Amino acid sequence: MSFRKEDGVSSLCQKALHIITELCFAGQVEWDKCSGIFPADRSGQGGGGTDISVSLLAVVVSFCGLALLVVSLFVFWKLCWPCWKSKLVAPNVSTLPQSISSAPTEVFETEEKKEVEENEKPAPKAIEPAIKISHTSPDIPAEVQTALKEHLIKHARVQRQTTDPTSSSRHNSFRRHLPRQMNVSSVDFSMGTEPVLQRGETRTSIGRIKPELYKQKSVDSEGNRKDDVKTCGKLNFALQYDYENELLVVKIIKALDLPAKDFTGTSDPYVKIYLLPDRKKKFQTRVHRKTLNPLFDELFQFPVVYDQLSNRKLHFSIYDFDRFSRHDMIGEVILDNLFEVSDLSREATVWKDIHCATTESIDLGEIMFSLCYLPTAGRMTLTVIKCRNLKAMDITGSSDPYVKVSLMCEGRRLKKRKTTTKKNTLNPVYNEAIIFDIPPENVDQVSLCIAVMDYDRVGHNEVIGVCRTGLDAEGLGRDHWNEMLAYHRKPITHWHPLLELPGRATSFDSQGSCSSPRPPSTP
């Protein structure tokens, strides 16, 4: 029984000792209280094992960190060294000897200073064969020295940055339609060594319009027109106004040098006369047989108010009478200004060339408009003022006219504008402005086509007459354009006669150079 009690007590002691050990090592009991229970050698063994494990862990961590640092440095050197090497080595240094590349940069600076001093001083008589860099460095040959100087001068220059001028984006929509455009990159913008005065004169002359050049062109154009028009004799007539009876008295005197229309070498001429724009009332002379120089001496009277004479024209048509066929037209004479010779208070005799024609020219009326161009803004203003004596297009003897203006470039219509429609009138008044944006460098490439249209509610609108203005126009159209360019910023107003469009149809949109443009071809 005693042995069993001892075994139970010992087991209880072991369990208590085990619990105390767990509490001590778990940190729930202070170590000083536990140190008296355990032997000293055992506690020392536990502390030494802990110190060894901590030191071993520190060694492992240090070694891993050092290895990671070495690996990162190696990778960084492999990646960045080629870039640094390419930057450090100049592209032209390889052509120089190896001895120059090993020289210090301070020598380069001293050589540059010496070169500046030598340029300021007179040139020496002889070139030194070599220059000592230091007491320990070898001699540099003279050829290497000159190459070094050239290299330094080349890299010491400050390169100037140049930019090409860019055009304004305002007229991009206009330039897309133009077949010809100025290549800005081909213009030479280099700085020359010209004198300042001469360069200033060149700048001021660019873009300036010289009126005398345009005047010379207009004079030449008038001479060319006279040469182009074929004449077929002369017509002599006299004009006088009867103030009491309000009559215009026209006396057809004679004609000279008419062409032969018959097989016999003669003609049977007679003359028709109109006071335009009224074609309902006409007069005709007697027929003179077999003569090329007929003598008429016949008087005709047109009832007209004196104040209306400035808006009237005399139209003479000379015909060759043929009994069995259609009468052949010899030519015509149109007197636009009845006051060309005098005020008609007394009889005034007039000689006019007979212009060859095969058909009678129909008077379609006139249009008055003004042109004004602002070169700085690149803006052209066409003001349609009014029309007069338009041709009647309706059965009622009237028309419903409106004006259609097209901006043309080499037969293609770039833009179009139109005025309001005036109802039942042959003398409409508009006073409407039409604006086009045209860059100054493209003014000589464009023209304006002005068409007077008759509005028709049913069917197509009909063309009454057209006129053109521009550098490629003829007669008054070109003169009006040149006058606008010579006196820019000032409205220039003129009357223009309306002409029949050759081969016209009932619709203006399908005619000639005023047709709708084709879309530009894509590259």
From Swiss-Prot:
GO terms for cellular component: exocytic vesicle; glutamatergic synapse; plasma membrane; presynapse; synaptic vesicle membrane. Ca(2+) 2 binds at residues 262, 320, 322, 328. InterPro entries: C2_dom, C2_domain_sf, Synaptotagmin. Binds 3 Ca(2+) ions per subunit. The ions are bound to the C2 domains. Gene3D superfamilies: C2 domain. Ca(2+) 3 binds at residues 322, 325, 328. It comes from the Eukaryota. Belongs to the synaptotagmin family. This is Synaptotagmin-10. It comes from Rattus norvegicus (Rat).
